[in-house]
């Protein structure tokens, strides 16, 4: 004896209807459309591939070789190298106070 079908399984349900996993399994087994699933029509194109718009990223060994070949950075007139901790102290909120000796 066959079980009576629920209205969601016999007719395509809307995208907002909630469907249980058992109902989804039943729809898949019957070859029916799944509710809320967008069907994409993807086809292979056998023509010329499109050109990349982004520049190629260097491989890690290429990036290391490039870094070694670049000249060392130079300072601009009127600037000094930052000492470690100096930048953090200058940008800390004024409500932060150091405590202790």
From Swiss-Prot:
A Gene Ontology CC term for this entry? peroxisome
The alphabetized UniProt keywords are: Peroxisome
Compartments in which it is found: Peroxisome
Q: Does the keyword Methyltransferase apply?
A: no
Q: Reply yes or no: does the keyword Repressor apply.
A: no
Under the heading InterPro entries, the entry gives: KPWE_PEX14_dom (IPR040554), PEX39 (IPR039995)
- Annotated membrane-spanning segments are none
Q: Major location, coarse class?
A: other
- Function as written in the Swiss-Prot or TrEMBL entry: May be a peroxin involved in the PTS2-mediated protein import pathway.
This chain belongs to the protein called Peroxisomal biogenesis factor 39
Phylogenetic lineage? Eukaryota, Metazoa, Chordata, Craniata, Vertebrata
């Amino acid at each position: 004896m066959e079980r009576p079908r629920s209205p969601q399984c016999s007719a395509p349900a809307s995208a907002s209807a909630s469907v249980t996993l058992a109902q989804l399994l039943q729809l898949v087994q019957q070859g029916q459309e799944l509710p809320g699933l967008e069907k994409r029509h993807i086809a292979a194109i056998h023509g010329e591939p499109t050109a990349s718009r982004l520049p190629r990223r260097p491989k890690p060994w290429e990036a290391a070789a490039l870094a070694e070949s670049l000249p060392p950075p130079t300072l601009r007139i009127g600037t000094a190298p930052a000492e470690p901790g100096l930048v953090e102290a200058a940008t800390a909120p004024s409500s932060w106070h150091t405590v202790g000796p």
